């Protein structure tokens, strides 16, 4: 009997091995759906972004007007713009759930997959940052000025580095043009890196909620999980459609409806909501270089996870003490997100400093120590 085409064709058998006959642990929950949803987000963002790029003009005198033109004059341009802007928010919601699941169930022990994932997070954050500058509103301009200025904290090369990125002595036309270039190319790099992420994942297979070896109990990805994933897909696209049509500006900043003006500083410069936790950590340290390092370390701490895993158990499912501190970390990150959106005054400064300290403490000290303690208590 001749093998089916999907198993014999050189290209189709790669797709078959990744999405159809892929052996998948039978007990994975809905938390394993987010990786697939991130793929959907990348496709939605690239599709809407391509059509927006056809009508956008990367010039300081025309950028703001070109966004207004897209929303008013282009067929369904308002929808494309809203889907793209809010799609970024859903992208980050999925990313944070995906990382949270990885931390909870010990997925970081697949080191290559995890490290590629953290690099992907940096790439997505860079893409979102340069994309936020493109409408050339007040918050776009001042956000770009403040964040790029942080590079001046680098010893010796800092000031030159900032001018090199700006393409001049301030954020101007050269900056906007290069940011548009980066915003256009980075999603394709993200798509390529996602393939590598999957390649490494399929070397080991998926983890599962118990953290045990699941080779004894696997089912094919299709039809079981392909249909199960459709539920998340419908919820994601449904929520994105509702937000983009009924409350498209809910997550945006009102200041961005004002064209960029280098002579007027907005009262509170803040990034989009998905960067607020890192922004709060940056602001909680009075020293500029210290703040920049803390900002970088708030994400780079994820690289340490496979190294500082001390427990003999993989998943937090059977680790009640560590589980409690995992949820404390989640609550702490939500507090940091809230603080990042508040003005720099007491009590927000001190709350931010305590929350920032706890963030690093839970990651690098409390959870690893609890791992050793639990090993002793369980005599393993």
From Swiss-Prot:
GO molecular function: metal ion binding; ubiquinol-cytochrome-c reductase activity
Record's cofactor remark: Binds 2 heme b groups non-covalently.
Pfam families: Cytochrom_B_C (PF00032), Cytochrome_B (PF00033)
Transmembrane regions: 34-54, 78-99, 114-134, 179-199, 227-247, 289-309, 321-341, 348-368
Similarity remark: Belongs to the cytochrome b family.
Protein name: Cytochrome b
Cofactor(s) required, per the database record: heme b
Lineage: superkingdom: Eukaryota
GO process annotations (BP): mitochondrial electron transport, ubiquinol to cytochrome c
Annotated residues for binding of heme b b562: 84, 183
CC terms in the record's Gene Ontology section: mitochondrial inner membrane; respiratory chain complex III
Alphabetical UniProt keywords: Electron transport, Heme, Iron, Membrane, Metal-binding, Mitochondrion, Mitochondrion inner membrane, Respiratory chain, Transmembrane, Transmembrane helix, Transport, Ubiquinone
Disulfide bonds: none
InterPro entries, per the entry: Cyt_b/b6_C, Cyt_b/b6_C_sf, Cyt_b/b6_N, Cytb/b6-like_sf, Cytochrome_b, Cytochrome_b_C_euk/bac, Cytochrome_b_N_euk/bac, Di-haem_cyt_TM
Binding residues annotated for heme b b566, in chain numbering: 98, 197
Binding site for a ubiquinone: 202
Membrane topology: Multi-pass membrane protein
CDD domains given in the database record: cytochrome_b_C, Cytochrome_b_N
Compartment annotation: Mitochondrion inner membrane
């Amino acid at each position: 009997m001749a093998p089916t085409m999907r198993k014999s064709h050189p290209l189709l058998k790669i797709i078959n091995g990744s999405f159809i006959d892929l052996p998948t642990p039978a007990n994975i929950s809905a938390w394993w759906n987010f990786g697939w949803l991130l793929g959907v987000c990348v496709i939605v963002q690239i599709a809407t972004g391509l059509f927006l790029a056809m009508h956008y003009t990367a010039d300081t005198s025309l950028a703001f007007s070109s966004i207004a033109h897209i929303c008013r004059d282009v067929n369904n341009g308002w929808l494309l713009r809203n889907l793209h802007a809010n799609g970024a928010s859903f992208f980050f919601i999925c990313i944070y759930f995906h990382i949270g699941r990885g931390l909870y169930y010990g997925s970081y022990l697949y080191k290559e997959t995890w490290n590629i994932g953290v690099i992907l997070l940096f790439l997505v954050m860079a893409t979102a940052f340069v994309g936020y500058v493109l409408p050339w509103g007040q918050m776009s301009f001042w956000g770009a000025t403040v964040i790029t200025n942080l590079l001046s904290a680098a010893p010796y090369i800092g000031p030159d580095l900032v001018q090199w990125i700006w393409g001049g002595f301030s954020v101007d036309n050269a900056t906007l043009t290069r940011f548009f270039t980066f915003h256009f190319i980075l999603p394709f790099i993200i798509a390529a890196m996602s393939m590598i992420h999957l390649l490494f994942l399929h070397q080991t297979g998926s983890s599962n909620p118990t953290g045990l070896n699941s080779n004894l109990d696997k089912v094919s990805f299709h039809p079981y999980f392909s249909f199960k994933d459709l539920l998340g897909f419908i919820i994601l696209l449904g929520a994105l459609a509702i937000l983009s049509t009924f409350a498209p500006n809910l997550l945006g900043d009102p200041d961005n409806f004002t064209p960029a003006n280098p002579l007027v500083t907005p009262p509170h410069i803040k990034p989009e909501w998905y960067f607020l936790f890192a922004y709060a950590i940056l602001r909680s340290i009075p020293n500029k270089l210290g703040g920049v390092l803390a900002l970088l370390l708030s994400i780079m701490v994820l690289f340490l996870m496979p190294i500082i895993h001390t427990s003999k158990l993989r998943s937090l499912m059977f680790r009640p003490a560590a589980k409690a501190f995992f949820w404390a970390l989640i609550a702490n990150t939500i507090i940091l997100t809230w603080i990042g959106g508040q003005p720099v005054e007491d009590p927000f400064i001190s709350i931010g400093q305590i929350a920032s300290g706890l963030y690093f403490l839970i990651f690098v000290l409390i959870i690893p120590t609890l791992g050793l303690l639990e090993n002793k208590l369980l005599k393993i």
